[in-house]
Amino acid sequence: MEGRGLSELFRNTSEDMFLKAMMENSMGVAAAAPSMEMMGFRNLSQGFREDSEELFNSWLMNGEIPGFSAMNNRPRQPSRLSSEAAGFPNQQHEIAQEHFPTDNLIPQNLAVHSEFTMNHNQQQLKNAAEKGMQASDLLLAKAWFHSTQPMTRSRSSELRKRYAAMQSNMPPITTETIETANKLRQDLTNASTVNSAPMSNTPSQTPTFVSPSSSSTSPLDNPHIVAQDTITSVVSMLKDTLERKKLSSHANGDTSSGISFGFYDSQHFQQNILGGTDIFPLVTTSQIQDSVMLPKVERPTEQGSGNFVAPANQVWLGTASREPSQSGSSTAIPAPSAGFEVCDDLPPIGQAMTVCESTRTNAANGNGTADCRSKGKDFRERILKENLKDDRKKGSLTRMGSISSEQADKGDPTKKRRVERSRKMAEAKERSSTPVIPSDIQVVLKRCETLEKEVRSLKLNLSFMNRKDSEQTKQIEELQKQNEDLVEEKERLLEEIERIVSDTNT
């Protein structure tokens, strides 16, 4: 609690000093803003680390819960980072090195009317003064977050789940907000000075929590822009056109028509930064001046967003697409850099290639464009040669069967039938042919065959004899019976003779 009271004391002191410096300026713009060292915050940074955990927890709750926003709870929160580029022009170098996150950026400036009164300017200056302490506290909270909770695989998956849950609760960007942004950009462009950056360069963003990419960057760096249905349809149509043009350019083998990337024409290129595969079609400024639904939004595309120091090499794109970028964007004023490095991921070969690596001197002299163009031309010629070699290899590896079958296919049908018939006869002969048997085994086999025949004949004779025997047995039995009958008749005749003889004697 002692640290909190000390924080409030220095916040009030910084408000007085900042407002005094602002009122002395005739333009009403923060042209001579006091630095962090003048207000004494540099030496007291160690004392504020005690409250960094509490500050980070409050910021985390404001970012995670959709209904519990900073605008409803803290009156100082809406101008936390929204006017940072216009409020601190003299701290440009310091802010660019510390690389403030833009997750809690609230598009309050989009609803501001074009006519700025003196009271409104004073209120904005007061909010900017109050923001100085909040930005330093947020920086300490981020440092504590990186030191105590390193990014691991499990935590990355958890943060992606939270991001997916929050993405469905984000409010869409309406037409009135875009029209108000156009009016605000025109008014601030006329009123801005050389040192101050216009607010139109600050993209209108809604608060998010975690990066949509799978890389282990900080979840405090990546903004997300909610697209409207009309914008989504236009972007999808531009993507289809881009795919058709890319296929036609690969098929016809055209040369690049005057862009620094050397692969495609002047309307599109495929961007692959930090492993992202989103396609951002380039639309010129003249094409979107008359469009209300597609205002021009300038934002830096960074190569790395994992540390506090802003990278020196940045590519500024004037695009009409409102799709979420895979890389983090910084609201700090970028360091002037003419060098850029963009990697294109070509789908036909599935490998990434560095298209251009130019220094500030080469880009200023115009040598970078020629180098990129020559590299792109050589790379496409190499791709075409590899594709031609692959086609030749595929043609040489094509087989039509065996040589004999290929020759038979080329002949007349009569010859084809003759060859087929001879092949079938040869196969039948091989199946019917018996293996060669030695002579002694052949003699034994023949002897066995003759013996089998004799045994068969003997069996027939035996059966015949048995049949004969049965007949003879029957005849014998009949004869025996007849014999018995004859014996009985003989005895009877003998008795008859004896009786007759006896009668004659008497």
Curated annotation (Swiss-Prot):
Induction summary: Induced in roots 7 weeks after inoculation with the arbuscular mycorrhiza (AM) fungus Glomus intraradices.
Keyword Nucleus: yes
Subcellular location: Nucleus
GO BP field: arbuscular mycorrhizal association
Tissue expression: Highly epressed in roots. Expressed at very low levels in leaves, stems and panicles.
Compositional bias annotation for Low complexity: 202-219
Protein role: Involved in arbuscular mycorrhizal (AM) symbiosis. Required for fungal infection in roots and arbuscule development during AM symbiosis.
Protein name in the entry: Protein CYCLOPS
Organism: Oryza sativa subsp. japonica
Lineage: Eukaryota, Viridiplantae, Streptophyta, Embryophyta, Tracheophyta
Name of the gene this protein is made from: CYCLOPS
